Amino acid sequence: MFHYVYILHSALDRERFYVGVTQDLKARLTKHNAGEVAHTSKFVPWQLKTYLAFSDKEQAFAFEKYLKSPSGRAFSKKRL
């Protein structure tokens, strides 16, 4: 089973991004857009900007943590 690190982009606020990890990317995006995720509910609809698949759960969470760091945010804005 893969773990997906994903980046969402708000269609409502073009400066708003969200980074997360899930095993079911389609279901998680549906929850974000239905307003069922408290952290993202104010900025729906969300569009999937990109995702990366990891076979190792710890690597996925480590990469998510990196993307949420200042250097990771700079990396994602420049490269993704």
Language model segments and positions:
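GIY-YIG nuclease catalytic motif and its immediate N-terminal context
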Residues: 1-38, 44-47, 51, 55-73, ...
